[in-house]
């Protein structure tokens, strides 16, 4: 299960490389402030995404640098962090290199859907819309 780079624009990949890991985004993230879980904060999401793409696409070079493919558990943890984000974009506002985070988080979610890692409620909502033509499940 490789990361599909088609979900990310060239600009997004360059922005992730440009992240200075300054931590400004951590202090402003309302979700992280509430739950204090590292998988949620922007630095971690960017670091994990970069790690996945390097392990999946650098081949021998990745092995030389000790980058190993992600386990299913690591991908699942990553997914929880990506989906707990509210997409408020406060991290973008304070980012010194102006990483456009909201579209980046959406691209990460697209990748997770490709892996089949998304909140179960999405299946319920899809089924309700398909069968009852609304998310409330009412006829």
Name the predicted role of every residue range:
Residues 33-49:
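Membrane-interface helix-loop junction between the first two transmembrane segments
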Residues 1-38:
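Long, charged N-terminal interaction/targeting segments
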């Amino acid at each position: 299960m490789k990361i599909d780079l088609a979900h990310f624009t060239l600009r997004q990949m360059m922005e992730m490389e440009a992240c200075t890991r300054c931590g400004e985004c951590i202090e402003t993230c309302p979700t992280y402030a509430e739950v204090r879980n590292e998988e949620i904060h922007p630095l971690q999401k960017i670091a994990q995404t970069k790690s996945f793409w390097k392990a999946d696409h650098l081949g021998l070079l990745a092995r030389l640098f000790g980058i190993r493919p992600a386990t299913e558990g690591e991908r699942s943890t990553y997914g929880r962090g990506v989906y707990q984000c509210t997409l408020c974009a406060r991290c973008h506002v304070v980012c010194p290199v102006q990483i456009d985070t909201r579209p980046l988080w959406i691209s990460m979610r697209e990748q997770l859907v490709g892996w089949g890692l998304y909140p179960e409620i999405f299946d319920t909502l899809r089924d309700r819309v398909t069968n009852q033509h609304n998310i409330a499940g009412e006829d």
